[in-house]
Amino acid sequence: MSEIATMAQGEAGAIGPGRLVLVVGPSGAGKDTLLQLAQAACIDDHDVVFPRRVVTRESSAAEDNIAMSPDEFRRGIDHGDFAVHWDAHGHSYALPLEINDDIRAGRAVVVNVSRTVIAALRQAYANVVVVAITAPPDVLAQRLAARARHSDGNIAERLSRSVEDASAQADVTILNAGSADYHSRQLVRVIRNESWRE
């Protein structure tokens, strides 16, 4: 697997004062489920933003991405439409440039990203919080098999990426092996910069 991250050009200094909450974790960890529940919990909080990622594949039912063809994606890069973009698992992903305006306005921006972009984003943004969402390997395998998304590719290969790898650069780790409602409440507390333990 090849993953490459590229930041938008022309930004000077770390962007703030808002927070960039990066959600990372292995396939099948339940990131999209927890993000959907957290977004619903924050629906009336105008200081929390959940931008849609741009992806060069069709979105699944659990995702709210903007699907683009590879050619459209390249044009977006050429036009400077993305704050950051990266390639992973044979697809291209990006975050819209507008997240910078939200962060400058003091909002918390919550995004699902590849862990390969963490270092670059920590340099580009003043207040980055990395939340690793993970689950035991047997739970990951069950979820991936049940999901059976064509773009998941080789499930065994995806599972070989260590669960610990997702947590290596994390500020907070959520072991998503129980109630999605409970774990989404943990995520909301992190997003709102509150204590996340019950």
From Swiss-Prot:
Top-level taxon in the UniProt lineage: Bacteria
Keywords of the record: ATP-binding, Nucleotide-binding, Transferase
The EC number(s) this enzyme carries: 2.7.4.23
A biological-process GO annotation: organic phosphonate metabolic process
Binding site for ATP: G25, P26, S27, G28, A29, G30, K31, D32
Reaction catalysis annotation: alpha-D-ribose 1,5-bisphosphate + ATP = 5-phospho-alpha-D-ribose 1-diphosphate + ADP
Pathway: Metabolic intermediate biosynthesis; 5-phospho-alpha-D-ribose 1-diphosphate biosynthesis; 5-phospho-alpha-D-ribose 1-diphosphate from D-ribose 5-phosphate (route II): step 3/3
Function: Catalyzes the phosphorylation of ribose 1,5-bisphosphate to 5-phospho-D-ribosyl alpha-1-diphosphate (PRPP).
Record-stated family: Belongs to the ribose 1,5-bisphosphokinase family.
Protein name: Ribose 1,5-bisphosphate phosphokinase PhnN
Name of the coding gene: phnN
